[in-house]
Amino acid sequence: MGWIQLQLSTTPDLAPEIESLLEAHHSLAITLVDAADQPVFEPARGETPLWDSIILTALFPNTINPEELIQNLNQDYHPKKLPPLEFRLLEDEDWERTWMDNFKPMRFGENLWICPSWATTPEPEAINIMLDPGLAFGTGTHPTTALCLSWLDRQNLKDKHLIDYGCGSGILGIAALLLGARQVIGVDNDPQALTASRSNCEKNQLDLKNFPVYLPKEFVRQINLKAIQPVDLLLANILAGPLIELAAYLAALVRSDGEILLSGILEDQAESVQEAYAPW
C-alpha cells in the first residue's frame, strides 16, 4: 500500500481554508512547513504563527483518482482559485527502519557519544549515552543541545552538583553524571519530560536518586523545604524569553563561585540575556 501526496504553496491567510477543504475530501494527514527558511520563535501565549510562505502537503489513499480530486477541489473552492497542485505516489516502506537508519551515533567533544539503543557504539571505551528519540526534547541533533554537550565534555565535573532547568529528555543531566557529576536535579514543566528523563537515566544504569526530576512547583517546594541547596553549575537550554524572565530566580540557585550555562539563544538575543544576568 502506498499513498497519494498532494503538495501546494500557500500563505497564512489561505492555509486554514485550504486545510479544511482537504479534510472535507478525506485527506489522511496534512503538514505545513516553512517554504523560505523564516524562523518563528517564542510566540505569545495562545498564538500559532505561520510563516509568510508555506508548503502544504496532504496525504490521500492511493485508491483516489488525482484528476477527479483536483476537479472536485477546484469545484468546491470556486469562485476562488487554488494554487497549482502537484501529485506524487509515495511507495510504502518500512518507516520504522527508515527512521532508525537516519538516527546514528553522534560525537560531542573528545569523549562523549550519543548512541541509539539499536546501534553499535563506535568507541566502546568512550562515554556513551544510550538514548532513543522519544517523548521529550533532547537527542543531540539540535544545535543548542550539541553546543551544551560539547561544552560539558570539556569541563571537570567530578563530584559537582548541577541543576538542569528545562531538562527535556535528560540528555544534559545524564551526560554530566557520566562525566563525573555527583548529582543533577532536573526541572521541566512537561510531565512527559520527567518520565523520559527517568527512563533514560535507568537505560544508562544511573541511580535515580542522583537525578531527581521535578515539575517547577514541586521544585520550588523542595527549595522552600531546604531540600535543595545552591549548586556548582546550572544548565538552562530553553529560550531567551524565559531565561531573561527567570534570571534572578536561576542565579539564586547557584553558589557564589558557581557557573551558569545558558543556551537556546539566537545571536541577536545574546546581549539581552547577558544584560539580564550581569548583576550576578
Question: What residue ranges belong to the model's regions?
Answer:
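A short, charged helix-loop
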Residues: 127-133
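S-adenosylmethionine
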Residues: 155, 189-280
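Surface-exposed loop/turn positions
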Residues: 110-112, 160, 258
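N-terminal auxiliary segments of SAM/dcSAM-dependent transferases
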Residues: 2-123
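Conserved SAM/SAH cofactor-binding pocket of Class I
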Residues: 135-218, 227
